[in-house]
Structure formats: C-alpha cells, structure tokens
Amino acid sequence: MNQPKDLSTRDRILQMMKTSGPLSTKEITGQLGITEMAVRRHLGTMERDGLIESKMVRQTLGRPTAVYGLTELAEGLFPKKYHTLTLDLLDELEQEYGEETVNRLFDRRKDKLNRQYEADMQGKDLLEKVQRLAEIQNENGYMTECETQENGHFVLMEHNCPISQIANRYNHACECELKLFESLLDAKVERTECLAQEGRKCVYVIKPS
C-alpha cells in the first residue's frame, strides 16, 4: 500500500494495521523497510500508550507468533462522521415530531447517566464527588480538570466537548449536563463559560447546597 511520505513511523504502522488488520513484527518490518529492532521499539511504545495490543497466533508450522492490532483508543484517531449522522437523525426527528421530542431524548440520556454514576458518589464528600466527576468526564473525552477555590467553592473545567457539534445545534444538551452535575454532586452548579456559546472551554462553579 502506498503511504504519504510525511507520515511518522507510528502513523504508518497505525495505517497499516487499519487497512491490513493485525500484523506480526516481521510483516511490519518488511513493509516499512526498517530494522526489526526499530519496529519492536515503536511497537513497545505504542503498546504502552494503549494504541495497540498483541495476541499469540498459532502457525501451521513452528511456534505461535505475536501479532499486533489496533485498540479502541487507536480506532478513535481515524476520522469519523458520527456527529453528522446524529445531527441528521435529530433534525429529521425534530421536523417530524417537534423540538420537545428531541429535548426528551436528551432528558432520558441525562437520567440514564445519573443512574449509571450515582453509586460512584455514595459516601463521598463534595470534593471527592467533584474529583470523581472529573475522572468520569475524562474517561468520556472531555479533558477535564478541577480546582478548589479559597472560598470553598470548586471549579470544573472541560477543555473538550465530544458532542460539541450537537450541543451547538441543540443547547438543551448543555442544560442536561448542568442538571446531571447538580444531581450527581447534590450541590449548586453554575456554568460560567460554554464551548457551545463561543467559550474556550466549559466552566462550572460548584457550591455546597
């Protein structure tokens, strides 16, 4: 397969695995034209970074050999158009049944997430809840960090929004996130900046109720 010359070795390996499936060190070495030691070094780094995983495959003759394939994390590096499909479906739903129907879908998603995570908050004080919420949001791709202010309030900052295209069109998604945080934290939550409203990040100020 012809590959762009300006791709890094790591990206070339990822692209090879995407198009060919799991590959052995020998197969990668043959396609890249570099030493096996260099390939193993790249594979080791990529495996530590969670981009690839190895498994042993039996051969017709000889000992089993290790092959390397993409993880779900690596699959996420390749372009996807899920938000376009989702927006198209939501727009069709809105045209057919009205905006309230779309809003109810966001409400149901909020309730589902609340049920999913409420057990994580049991027995925790507010700081621990905020820290756990930041972990949850990070796991979902929001690039979240939290800070404690001198007045005892907390600030939760989300530097990325995986559903930004949807939130830009349907602001009710943002309102549901705010209500979800209030429910999980059992606290007063105020959003002072929002990516969907031309902010650089989403910022939530959290106060004890």
Model-derived features with residue positions:
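Short, well-ordered beta-strand micro-motif
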Residues: G69, V205-K207
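Short, charged/polar, Gly/Pro-enriched secondary-structure boundary elements
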Residues: L73-F78, I163-Q165, S209
